[in-house]
Swiss-Prot record:
Family: Belongs to the cyanase family.
SUPFAM superfamilies named in the record: Cyanase C-terminal domain (SSF55234), lambda repressor-like DNA-binding domains (SSF47413)
E.C. number(s) listed in UniProt: 4.2.1.104
Taxonomic source organism: Teredinibacter turnerae (strain ATCC 39867 / T7901)
Enzyme class: lyase
Keyword RNA-binding appears in the UniProt entry: no
Name the UniProt record assigns to this protein: Cyanate hydratase
A GO term for molecular function: DNA binding
Pfam families with a match to the protein in the record: Cyanate_lyase, CYNS_N
Lineage start: Bacteria, Pseudomonadati, Pseudomonadota, Gammaproteobacteria, Cellvibrionales
Length: 146
């Protein structure tokens, strides 16, 4: 079974059972963003988590092995047409250089890890319209001279 097949089975089971990513993550005892990413094929699951997910969603045989496989973390190089994803590209396009300057001013020359990393999505109620709060929390990795 391939990762894409498992992703499709997960999405179908989620829909049929009227579940949320947050609910699935809570059942697994893991973070919502990470579980969603793993279910969409962009992270590999530890065996115990994969077993629990397969049992919870009654996934077909072979799903556990596919969930545990190391993913190829690649994506299309074209800017996505989905408006929400496009806006994230736009944020980086408009503010990327600014973020780089501010981060390097505070930390020095380096990067933010996407390996030693967590991400959270929260909803903030606001009288002018509810706000999306994205928190990206990555370890700073300084470049070294040699």
């Amino acid at each position: 079974m391939k990762k894409i097949d498992v992703t499709e089975a997960i999405i179908l089971a989620k829909k049929e059972r009227n579940l949320t990513w947050e609910g699935i993550a809570a059942e697994l005892g893991m973070g919502t963003v990470w579980v969603t990413s793993a279910c969409l094929g962009m992270n590999s699951m530890p065996e115990a988590v994969a077993e629990k997910l397969c049992a919870y969603l009654e996934l077909p045989e072979g799903a556990k092995a596919a969930l545990m496989e190391y993913p190829t973390k690649a994506w299309d190089k074209e800017v996505p047409q989905d408006p929400l994803i496009y806006r994230l590209y736009e944020v980086v396009g408009v503010y990327g250089d600014t973020l780089k300057e501010v981060i390097q001013e505070k930390f020095g020359d380096g990067i933010m890890s996407a390996i030693d990393f967590t991400m959270d999505v929260a909803k903030e109620e606001n009288p002018k319209g509810d706000r999306v709060v994205l928190t990206l929390n990555g370890k700073f990795l300084p470049y070294k001279a040699w």
